[in-house]
Curated annotation (Swiss-Prot):
Organism in which the protein naturally occurs: Arabidopsis thaliana
Species classification: Eukaryota, Viridiplantae, Streptophyta, Embryophyta, Tracheophyta
Protein name from the UniProt record: Uncharacterized protein At2g02148
Residue ranges, compositional bias (Low complexity): 341-366
Region (Disordered): 37-61, 127-151, 298-378
Biased composition (Polar residues): 312-335
Length: 432
Protein backbone atom coordinates (compact mmCIF):
# COMPACT_ATOMS: atom_id res chain seq x y z
CA UNK A 1 0.00 0.00 0.00
CA UNK A 2 2.97 2.30 0.44
CA UNK A 3 3.60 2.24 -3.29
CA UNK A 4 0.09 3.46 -4.06
CA UNK A 5 0.24 6.63 -1.96
CA UNK A 6 1.42 8.51 -5.07
CA UNK A 7 -2.07 8.25 -6.51
CA UNK A 8 -2.97 11.25 -4.37
CA UNK A 9 -0.80 13.47 -6.57
CA UNK A 10 -3.21 13.06 -9.47
CA UNK A 11 -5.33 16.18 -9.12
CA UNK A 12 -8.51 15.28 -10.95
CA UNK A 13 -9.81 18.78 -10.50
CA UNK A 14 -7.09 20.20 -12.74
CA UNK A 15 -8.94 19.01 -15.82
CA UNK A 16 -11.23 22.01 -15.46
CA UNK A 17 -8.35 24.31 -16.38
CA UNK A 18 -8.19 22.72 -19.83
CA UNK A 19 -11.81 22.04 -20.62
CA UNK A 20 -14.13 23.97 -18.37
CA UNK A 21 -17.48 23.28 -20.00
CA UNK A 22 -16.98 19.92 -21.69
CA UNK A 23 -18.85 17.74 -19.24
CA UNK A 24 -20.62 18.87 -16.13
CA UNK A 25 -20.69 15.45 -14.57
CA UNK A 26 -17.00 15.67 -13.69
CA UNK A 27 -17.70 18.64 -11.44
CA UNK A 28 -19.09 16.24 -8.90
CA UNK A 29 -15.59 14.81 -8.44
CA UNK A 30 -14.25 18.17 -7.37
CA UNK A 31 -14.51 18.33 -3.64
CA UNK A 32 -12.52 18.57 -0.43
CA UNK A 33 -9.20 16.77 -0.21
CA UNK A 34 -10.72 14.13 2.03
CA UNK A 35 -13.03 13.07 -0.84
CA UNK A 36 -10.05 12.79 -3.11
CA UNK A 37 -8.28 10.67 -0.50
CA UNK A 38 -11.30 8.44 -0.50
CA UNK A 39 -11.07 8.06 -4.19
CA UNK A 40 -7.37 7.22 -3.81
CA UNK A 41 -8.28 4.51 -1.33
CA UNK A 42 -10.83 3.10 -3.72
CA UNK A 43 -8.27 3.02 -6.43
CA UNK A 44 -5.88 1.31 -4.04
CA UNK A 45 -8.45 -1.36 -3.22
CA UNK A 46 -8.97 -2.03 -6.95
CA UNK A 47 -5.28 -1.91 -7.78
CA UNK A 48 -5.24 -4.94 -10.03
CA UNK A 49 -6.06 -2.83 -13.06
CA UNK A 50 -3.23 -0.43 -12.25
CA UNK A 51 -0.80 -3.28 -11.89
CA UNK A 52 -1.75 -4.68 -15.25
CA UNK A 53 -1.54 -1.30 -16.96
CA UNK A 54 1.65 0.03 -15.44
CA UNK A 55 2.73 1.74 -18.64
CA UNK A 56 -0.50 3.70 -19.10
CA UNK A 57 -0.53 7.49 -18.88
CA UNK A 58 -2.35 9.66 -16.43
CA UNK A 59 -5.17 10.15 -18.96
CA UNK A 60 -6.26 6.55 -18.29
CA UNK A 61 -7.34 7.57 -14.80
CA UNK A 62 -10.04 9.81 -16.25
CA UNK A 63 -13.64 8.82 -16.37
CA UNK A 64 -14.67 6.72 -19.37
CA UNK A 65 -17.42 9.12 -20.42
CA UNK A 66 -14.90 11.96 -20.35
CA UNK A 67 -12.55 10.09 -22.73
CA UNK A 68 -15.36 9.22 -25.10
CA UNK A 69 -16.55 12.80 -25.28
CA UNK A 70 -13.05 14.00 -26.11
CA UNK A 71 -12.71 11.57 -29.01
CA UNK A 72 -16.10 12.39 -30.43
CA UNK A 73 -15.40 16.12 -30.32
CA UNK A 74 -12.10 15.80 -32.17
CA UNK A 75 -13.56 13.54 -34.83
CA UNK A 76 -16.46 15.87 -35.51
CA UNK A 77 -14.20 18.92 -35.73
CA UNK A 78 -11.76 17.18 -38.04
CA UNK A 79 -14.51 15.95 -40.34
CA UNK A 80 -15.95 19.43 -40.62
CA UNK A 81 -12.60 20.89 -41.63
CA UNK A 82 -11.97 18.16 -44.17
CA UNK A 83 -15.38 18.55 -45.77
CA UNK A 84 -14.92 22.31 -45.91
CA UNK A 85 -11.56 22.32 -47.70
CA UNK A 86 -11.53 19.19 -49.85
CA UNK A 87 -14.25 20.41 -52.21
CA UNK A 88 -12.15 23.03 -54.01
CA UNK A 89 -8.59 22.87 -52.71
CA UNK A 90 -7.33 20.61 -55.50
CA UNK A 91 -6.62 22.12 -58.92
CA UNK A 92 -6.34 19.71 -61.84
CA UNK A 93 -4.79 20.24 -65.22
CA UNK A 94 -8.21 19.69 -66.81
CA UNK A 95 -9.43 22.90 -65.16
CA UNK A 96 -7.04 25.05 -67.18
CA UNK A 97 -6.80 23.08 -70.43
CA UNK A 98 -6.64 24.65 -72.91
CA UNK A 99 -4.99 27.62 -71.27
CA UNK A 100 -6.33 30.11 -73.83
CA UNK A 101 -9.92 29.17 -73.03
CA UNK A 102 -9.21 29.35 -69.30
CA UNK A 103 -7.84 32.88 -69.68
CA UNK A 104 -10.94 34.10 -71.47
CA UNK A 105 -13.22 32.35 -69.00
CA UNK A 106 -11.44 33.85 -66.02
CA UNK A 107 -11.60 37.37 -67.46
CA UNK A 108 -15.26 37.00 -68.38
CA UNK A 109 -16.17 35.96 -64.84
CA UNK A 110 -14.63 39.14 -63.47
CA UNK A 111 -16.42 41.35 -66.00
CA UNK A 112 -19.81 39.65 -65.65
CA UNK A 113 -20.11 39.09 -61.91
CA UNK A 114 -17.66 41.37 -60.10
CA UNK A 115 -18.66 44.58 -61.93
CA UNK A 116 -22.21 45.92 -61.70
CA UNK A 117 -23.83 48.57 -63.86
CA UNK A 118 -26.21 51.37 -62.92
CA UNK A 119 -27.94 53.21 -65.78
CA UNK A 120 -30.43 56.03 -65.95
CA UNK A 121 -32.68 57.12 -68.76
CA UNK A 122 -31.57 60.12 -70.77
CA UNK A 123 -34.18 62.86 -70.80
CA UNK A 124 -35.16 64.58 -74.05
CA UNK A 125 -33.96 68.04 -73.00
CA UNK A 126 -30.50 66.80 -72.18
CA UNK A 127 -30.35 64.82 -75.41
CA UNK A 128 -31.26 67.85 -77.52
CA UNK A 129 -28.71 69.96 -75.66
CA UNK A 130 -26.00 67.43 -76.43
CA UNK A 131 -26.94 67.45 -80.10
CA UNK A 132 -26.85 71.26 -80.35
CA UNK A 133 -23.52 71.58 -78.56
CA UNK A 134 -21.92 68.62 -80.32
CA UNK A 135 -21.28 70.27 -83.71
CA UNK A 136 -20.04 73.72 -84.63
CA UNK A 137 -22.43 74.21 -87.55
CA UNK A 138 -25.57 72.51 -88.81
CA UNK A 139 -23.87 71.29 -91.98
CA UNK A 140 -21.30 69.21 -90.12
CA UNK A 141 -20.71 65.77 -91.57
CA UNK A 142 -20.55 64.08 -88.17
CA UNK A 143 -23.88 64.45 -86.40
CA UNK A 144 -25.39 62.65 -83.50
CA UNK A 145 -28.93 61.36 -83.89
CA UNK A 146 -31.45 62.62 -81.39
CA UNK A 147 -32.76 59.12 -80.63
CA UNK A 148 -29.36 57.42 -80.54
CA UNK A 149 -28.68 57.35 -76.80
CA UNK A 150 -31.48 56.25 -74.49
CA UNK A 151 -29.58 55.21 -71.39
CA UNK A 152 -26.33 56.27 -69.82
CA UNK A 153 -24.30 55.36 -66.78
CA UNK A 154 -25.37 56.90 -63.51
CA UNK A 155 -22.88 59.69 -62.64
CA UNK A 156 -23.33 58.98 -58.94
CA UNK A 157 -21.45 55.71 -59.51
CA UNK A 158 -17.92 56.31 -60.79
CA UNK A 159 -15.42 53.47 -60.92
CA UNK A 160 -11.73 54.14 -61.67
CA UNK A 161 -10.16 51.94 -64.32
CA UNK A 162 -7.24 51.49 -61.96
CA UNK A 163 -9.48 49.67 -59.49
CA UNK A 164 -10.59 47.19 -62.16
CA UNK A 165 -7.02 46.59 -63.30
CA UNK A 166 -5.87 46.13 -59.71
CA UNK A 167 -8.59 43.56 -59.03
CA UNK A 168 -7.77 41.62 -62.18
CA UNK A 169 -4.04 41.53 -61.51
CA UNK A 170 -4.56 40.53 -57.87
CA UNK A 171 -6.70 37.54 -58.80
CA UNK A 172 -4.34 36.63 -61.64
CA UNK A 173 -1.42 36.61 -59.21
CA UNK A 174 -3.23 34.21 -56.89
CA UNK A 175 -4.13 31.92 -59.79
CA UNK A 176 -0.56 31.92 -61.10
CA UNK A 177 0.67 30.65 -57.75
CA UNK A 178 -1.71 27.72 -58.08
CA UNK A 179 -0.69 27.07 -61.68
CA UNK A 180 2.97 26.88 -60.72
CA UNK A 181 2.32 23.58 -58.91
CA UNK A 182 0.87 21.89 -62.02
CA UNK A 183 2.98 19.84 -64.39
CA UNK A 184 2.37 19.67 -68.11
CA UNK A 185 1.52 23.35 -68.70
CA UNK A 186 3.99 25.47 -70.59
CA UNK A 187 2.39 28.87 -69.96
CA UNK A 188 2.09 29.21 -66.20
CA UNK A 189 -0.05 32.36 -66.28
CA UNK A 190 -3.79 32.87 -66.46
CA UNK A 191 -3.57 36.59 -67.17
CA UNK A 192 -3.71 38.54 -70.42
CA UNK A 193 -2.03 41.89 -71.04
CA UNK A 194 -4.32 44.77 -70.16
CA UNK A 195 -3.87 46.54 -73.50
CA UNK A 196 -4.01 43.38 -75.65
CA UNK A 197 -6.77 42.67 -78.17
CA UNK A 198 -8.45 40.23 -75.79
CA UNK A 199 -7.35 42.04 -72.65
CA UNK A 200 -9.23 43.81 -69.92
CA UNK A 201 -9.39 47.27 -71.51
CA UNK A 202 -10.79 46.07 -74.85
CA UNK A 203 -13.29 43.73 -73.21
CA UNK A 204 -14.40 46.47 -70.86
CA UNK A 205 -14.94 48.93 -73.71
CA UNK A 206 -16.88 46.33 -75.68
CA UNK A 207 -19.23 45.49 -72.83
CA UNK A 208 -19.62 49.06 -71.58
CA UNK A 209 -19.33 51.17 -74.75
CA UNK A 210 -18.72 54.88 -74.89
CA UNK A 211 -21.34 55.36 -77.62
CA UNK A 212 -24.60 53.70 -78.53
CA UNK A 213 -28.06 53.26 -77.12
CA UNK A 214 -26.54 52.71 -73.67
CA UNK A 215 -23.36 54.67 -73.13
CA UNK A 216 -20.92 54.86 -70.26
CA UNK A 217 -19.04 58.11 -70.13
CA UNK A 218 -15.36 58.26 -69.28
CA UNK A 219 -14.02 61.14 -67.25
CA UNK A 220 -10.48 62.11 -66.44
CA UNK A 221 -9.99 63.23 -62.86
CA UNK A 222 -7.00 64.84 -61.23
CA UNK A 223 -5.96 65.59 -57.69
CA UNK A 224 -8.74 67.73 -56.23
CA UNK A 225 -11.11 67.90 -53.31
CA UNK A 226 -13.49 65.48 -55.05
CA UNK A 227 -10.82 62.87 -55.65
CA UNK A 228 -9.48 63.16 -52.11
CA UNK A 229 -12.98 62.56 -50.77
CA UNK A 230 -14.20 59.81 -53.09
CA UNK A 231 -10.92 58.07 -53.90
CA UNK A 232 -8.43 58.73 -51.09
CA UNK A 233 -6.44 55.61 -52.02
CA UNK A 234 -5.47 57.13 -55.37
CA UNK A 235 -4.08 60.36 -53.90
CA UNK A 236 -0.41 59.77 -53.18
CA UNK A 237 1.64 62.41 -51.45
CA UNK A 238 4.76 61.46 -53.40
CA UNK A 239 3.00 62.24 -56.68
CA UNK A 240 2.55 65.94 -57.30
CA UNK A 241 -0.50 65.43 -59.50
CA UNK A 242 -2.33 62.16 -60.06
CA UNK A 243 -4.56 61.63 -63.09
CA UNK A 244 -6.87 58.68 -63.61
CA UNK A 245 -9.96 57.79 -65.62
CA UNK A 246 -13.32 56.85 -64.11
CA UNK A 247 -16.32 55.22 -65.80
CA UNK A 248 -19.79 56.43 -64.91
CA UNK A 249 -22.36 53.85 -63.91
CA UNK A 250 -20.01 51.05 -62.82
CA UNK A 251 -19.32 49.63 -59.40
CA UNK A 252 -17.42 46.64 -57.98
CA UNK A 253 -19.36 43.80 -56.33
CA UNK A 254 -17.31 42.34 -53.52
CA UNK A 255 -19.50 39.25 -53.01
CA UNK A 256 -21.51 38.29 -56.11
CA UNK A 257 -24.54 36.09 -55.46
CA UNK A 258 -25.66 35.29 -59.01
CA UNK A 259 -22.57 33.30 -59.98
CA UNK A 260 -23.43 29.76 -61.17
CA UNK A 261 -22.31 26.88 -58.97
CA UNK A 262 -20.01 25.42 -61.62
CA UNK A 263 -18.31 28.75 -62.24
CA UNK A 264 -18.03 29.43 -58.51
CA UNK A 265 -16.34 26.09 -57.81
CA UNK A 266 -13.93 26.62 -60.71
CA UNK A 267 -13.10 30.11 -59.46
CA UNK A 268 -12.37 28.81 -55.95
CA UNK A 269 -10.19 26.00 -57.24
CA UNK A 270 -8.26 28.38 -59.45
CA UNK A 271 -7.65 31.14 -56.91
CA UNK A 272 -7.57 29.02 -53.74
CA UNK A 273 -10.11 31.21 -51.95
CA UNK A 274 -12.67 29.82 -49.52
CA UNK A 275 -15.52 31.70 -51.14
CA UNK A 276 -16.29 33.76 -54.21
CA UNK A 277 -15.64 37.11 -52.58
CA UNK A 278 -13.12 39.93 -52.61
CA UNK A 279 -12.25 42.75 -50.25
CA UNK A 280 -11.24 46.38 -50.58
CA UNK A 281 -7.56 45.58 -50.15
CA UNK A 282 -7.67 43.57 -53.38
CA UNK A 283 -8.25 46.64 -55.58
CA UNK A 284 -8.28 49.89 -53.59
CA UNK A 285 -4.68 51.00 -53.94
CA UNK A 286 -2.57 53.17 -56.21
CA UNK A 287 -0.63 51.30 -58.89
CA UNK A 288 0.63 53.39 -61.84
CA UNK A 289 1.00 51.61 -65.16
CA UNK A 290 3.24 53.39 -67.62
CA UNK A 291 4.55 51.86 -70.79
CA UNK A 292 7.41 53.50 -72.66
CA UNK A 293 8.62 52.89 -76.17
CA UNK A 294 11.66 50.71 -76.64
CA UNK A 295 14.15 53.02 -78.32
CA UNK A 296 17.90 52.74 -78.35
CA UNK A 297 19.54 55.72 -76.75
CA UNK A 298 22.16 57.35 -78.95
CA UNK A 299 24.16 58.49 -75.92
CA UNK A 300 24.50 54.94 -74.64
CA UNK A 301 25.67 53.77 -78.05
CA UNK A 302 28.38 56.45 -78.06
CA UNK A 303 29.63 55.37 -74.65
CA UNK A 304 29.67 51.75 -75.76
CA UNK A 305 31.63 52.25 -78.98
CA UNK A 306 34.89 50.56 -77.88
CA UNK A 307 33.20 47.41 -76.53
CA UNK A 308 30.12 46.92 -78.77
CA UNK A 309 27.99 45.14 -76.13
CA UNK A 310 25.64 42.55 -77.63
CA UNK A 311 26.84 43.00 -81.23
CA UNK A 312 29.02 40.55 -83.12
CA UNK A 313 31.86 42.39 -84.84
CA UNK A 314 32.10 39.84 -87.63
CA UNK A 315 28.41 40.19 -88.47
CA UNK A 316 28.69 43.96 -88.37
CA UNK A 317 31.60 43.89 -90.76
CA UNK A 318 29.89 41.52 -93.17
CA UNK A 319 26.82 43.73 -93.40
CA UNK A 320 28.98 46.56 -94.69
CA UNK A 321 30.38 44.41 -97.53
CA UNK A 322 33.80 43.84 -95.95
CA UNK A 323 34.99 40.24 -95.70
CA UNK A 324 38.33 39.41 -94.18
CA UNK A 325 40.69 37.16 -96.05
CA UNK A 326 40.89 33.84 -94.23
CA UNK A 327 44.40 33.10 -95.48
CA UNK A 328 45.72 36.39 -94.15
CA UNK A 329 44.07 35.77 -90.79
CA UNK A 330 45.78 32.43 -90.44
CA UNK A 331 49.27 33.86 -91.12
CA UNK A 332 48.77 36.93 -88.92
CA UNK A 333 51.00 36.75 -85.84
CA UNK A 334 49.62 37.42 -82.38
CA UNK A 335 51.62 40.64 -81.72
CA UNK A 336 49.91 42.36 -84.64
CA UNK A 337 46.44 41.55 -83.25
CA UNK A 338 47.37 42.97 -79.90
CA UNK A 339 48.73 46.09 -81.54
CA UNK A 340 45.60 46.46 -83.71
CA UNK A 341 43.35 46.35 -80.64
CA UNK A 342 45.43 49.05 -78.98
CA UNK A 343 45.21 51.19 -82.11
CA UNK A 344 41.41 50.83 -82.31
CA UNK A 345 41.08 51.70 -78.62
CA UNK A 346 43.17 54.83 -79.10
CA UNK A 347 41.23 55.73 -82.21
CA UNK A 348 37.89 55.67 -80.37
CA UNK A 349 39.34 57.75 -77.60
CA UNK A 350 40.16 60.40 -80.18
CA UNK A 351 36.42 60.83 -80.82
CA UNK A 352 35.92 62.20 -77.30
CA UNK A 353 39.34 63.78 -76.78
CA UNK A 354 40.65 65.75 -79.74
CA UNK A 355 44.05 66.44 -78.19
CA UNK A 356 45.01 62.75 -78.64
CA UNK A 357 44.68 62.94 -82.43
CA UNK A 358 48.37 63.50 -83.14
CA UNK A 359 49.37 60.81 -80.69
CA UNK A 360 47.27 58.19 -82.51
CA UNK A 361 48.83 59.20 -85.86
CA UNK A 362 52.32 58.84 -84.39
CA UNK A 363 51.48 55.36 -83.06
CA UNK A 364 50.05 54.27 -86.41
CA UNK A 365 53.24 55.41 -88.18
CA UNK A 366 55.33 53.64 -85.55
CA UNK A 367 53.36 50.44 -86.17
CA UNK A 368 53.91 50.76 -89.93
CA UNK A 369 57.72 50.85 -89.48
CA UNK A 370 57.79 47.75 -87.28
CA UNK A 371 55.08 45.75 -89.09
CA UNK A 372 55.13 46.82 -92.75
CA UNK A 373 53.41 43.66 -93.96
CA UNK A 374 50.39 44.14 -91.68
CA UNK A 375 49.80 47.81 -92.36
CA UNK A 376 47.42 47.13 -95.21
CA UNK A 377 45.26 44.99 -92.90
CA UNK A 378 44.87 47.51 -90.10
CA UNK A 379 43.66 50.49 -92.11
CA UNK A 380 40.70 48.88 -93.95
CA UNK A 381 39.47 47.21 -90.77
CA UNK A 382 39.61 50.43 -88.81
CA UNK A 383 37.91 52.41 -91.53
CA UNK A 384 35.06 49.93 -91.94
CA UNK A 385 34.68 49.58 -88.19
CA UNK A 386 34.47 53.35 -87.92
CA UNK A 387 31.75 53.44 -90.57
CA UNK A 388 29.81 50.67 -88.84
CA UNK A 389 30.01 52.48 -85.50
CA UNK A 390 29.00 55.89 -86.75
CA UNK A 391 26.26 54.78 -89.13
CA UNK A 392 23.64 53.98 -86.43
CA UNK A 393 24.08 57.50 -85.09
CA UNK A 394 22.80 58.98 -88.33
CA UNK A 395 19.88 56.54 -88.62
CA UNK A 396 16.43 56.48 -87.09
CA UNK A 397 17.42 55.95 -83.47
CA UNK A 398 16.40 59.49 -82.56
CA UNK A 399 13.36 60.48 -80.55
CA UNK A 400 10.48 61.60 -82.82
CA UNK A 401 9.86 65.32 -83.09
CA UNK A 402 6.05 65.02 -83.13
CA UNK A 403 4.15 63.52 -80.16
CA UNK A 404 2.52 60.11 -80.38
CA UNK A 405 -0.97 60.00 -81.89
CA UNK A 406 -2.08 56.83 -80.10
CA UNK A 407 -1.71 55.72 -76.50
CA UNK A 408 0.94 53.08 -75.93
CA UNK A 409 -1.00 51.48 -73.09
CA UNK A 410 -4.58 51.11 -74.33
CA UNK A 411 -4.23 52.07 -78.01
CA UNK A 412 -6.81 54.85 -77.90
CA UNK A 413 -6.34 57.92 -80.08
CA UNK A 414 -5.58 61.22 -78.38
CA UNK A 415 -8.43 63.69 -78.70
CA UNK A 416 -6.26 66.79 -79.05
CA UNK A 417 -2.76 67.45 -80.25
CA UNK A 418 -1.95 69.15 -76.95
CA UNK A 419 -3.24 66.32 -74.73
CA UNK A 420 -0.65 65.32 -72.17
CA UNK A 421 -2.53 62.30 -70.84
CA UNK A 422 -4.69 59.59 -72.40
CA UNK A 423 -8.42 60.06 -71.90
CA UNK A 424 -8.98 56.31 -71.61
CA UNK A 425 -6.36 54.98 -69.21
CA UNK A 426 -4.69 58.17 -67.99
CA UNK A 427 -1.16 57.24 -69.01
CA UNK A 428 1.25 60.04 -69.89
CA UNK A 429 1.73 60.87 -73.56
CA UNK A 430 5.19 60.47 -75.00
CA UNK A 431 6.84 63.31 -76.87
CA UNK A 432 5.37 66.17 -74.80
Amino acid sequence: MGARVQVQHYNLGSSDSYIATSLHDLNSVDGPPRDIDGIGGAVGRDGDSLDNDGDSSSADCMHESYRNSMQIGVEEGGSNMENKGSAYIMLNIEDVSPIEAARGRFLQIILDYFISQHVIEVCESKRDHDVDSGGRDSNSKVKRKSDDTRYEGDPSFALPLMYIANLYETLVGEANVRLASLNGIRDKTIGVALEAAGGLYRKLTKKFPKKGTCMYRRRELATSVETRTRFPELVIHEEKRVRFVVVNGLDIVEKPSDLPIEEAEWFKRLTGRNEVAISARDYKFYCPRRKHRRLQNSVSSINGLPTFPGIDSSTLANTQGFREDQSQQQHTPSPSKHHMSSLSHQFHQSIHQSHQHHQSIYQSQHAATHYPSQNHQCDPELSHTQMACLQPLTGGHVMPNSPAKFCDQCGAQYLRETSKFCSECGSKRLGI
